[in-house]
Amino acid sequence: MTAVTPDGRKLLRIEARNAQVPIERKPAWIRTRARMGPQYHALKELVRREGLHTVCEEAGCPNIFECWEDREATFLIGGDTCSRNCSFCQISSGRPQPLDRDEPRRVAESVARMGLRYATVTGVTRDDLDDEGAWLYAQTVREIHHAVPGCGVELLTPDFHGRPELLDEVFSARPEVFAHNIETVPRIFKSIRPGFRYERSLDVLRAAHDAGLVTKSNLILGLGETRQEIRAALADLRSAGCDLVTITQYLRPSIRHHPVVRWVEPAEFEELAAEARELGFAGVMSGPLVRSSYRAGRLYRAAIASRTDRRTDGATTQAPQTP
């Protein structure tokens, strides 16, 4: 009998191979404690009352309590189906739905209703569209800036195949932070992210840096990389002009996904954070439960503090007016 996914899709060959490895037992340090303060409760009630949707809740992020207490949240745009298939990601891949051109307005409205100080916007790849979703990403930033003056926006995008005209469209919206995640090291990159290219991802970050944007990326550990390869990838990111970096532990979403090769101990995350700072990153978040959008507003403010002399379009880059 042919194995299928919960939604009825036939397993890909790589998924079938992954499924032969049982789900790994998590170590004791992969724990989070729920601290539900007044801001979290207020935001939770607002989301329930208004019928809003965030990645924070729908993906079961372990950091939701901390981020919501700081009025930070993450939104997913472009639908719930990705046109590429990364072996670590729980988002479904396949033929995406038709583009919803009203989505940017609705996301901005949600940000306003939630009273966010900082919003992260990410999305699926849309290789089915002529512009690969560049307009959608850019317009969402513009709508949030218009609806909620002073709210910082972090935009986490795919690579748009490195097409300069599409990158320029996204850069023109001037997000406070432009993020593009390399996720892993060159040796295993193709097997982990077959629809992407390591050097192309670095080129995207370099282009954003050259456009005067604060840039950010993420590395996931536990996929089969070595410590030396991690250090080299961090150096590659800095050479590309990356300002901020998050370093995270891979947690396997299901038996179909890439197995966890190793559990990285908290002490190693601390060592890697120190190494990243020595390389010159303006902001670093490194830990087993860190995610790429974890405390995104705090990292942005760290970058601004270290780049007060940087000029963008003839004006000093300014942080949004948040506490």
Curated annotation (Swiss-Prot):
Residues 68-282 form the Radical SAM core domain. Binds 2 [4Fe-4S] clusters per subunit. One cluster is coordinated with 3 cysteines and an exchangeable S-adenosyl-L-methionine. The keyword 4Fe-4S applies. InterPro entries: Aldolase_TIM (IPR013785), Elp3/MiaA/NifB-like_rSAM (IPR006638), LIAS_N (IPR031691), Lipoyl_synth (IPR003698), rSAM (IPR007197). [4Fe-4S] cluster 1 binds at residues 56, 61, 67, 293. It is an enzyme of class 2 (transferase). It is found in: Cytoplasm. Its cofactor is [4Fe-4S] cluster. GO terms for cellular component: cytoplasm. Pathway: Protein modification; protein lipoylation via endogenous pathway; protein N(6)-(lipoyl)lysine from octanoyl-[acyl-carrier-protein]: step 2/2. Keywords: 4Fe-4S, Cytoplasm, Iron, Iron-sulfur, Metal-binding, S-adenosyl-L-methionine, Transferase. PROSITE patterns: RADICAL_SAM (PS51918). NCBIfam families: lipA, PRK05481.1, PRK12928.1. This is Lipoyl synthase. It comes from Acidothermus cellulolyticus (strain ATCC 43068 / DSM 8971 / 11B). The lineage of its organism: Bacteria, Bacillati, Actinomycetota, Actinomycetes, Acidothermales. The gene is lipA.
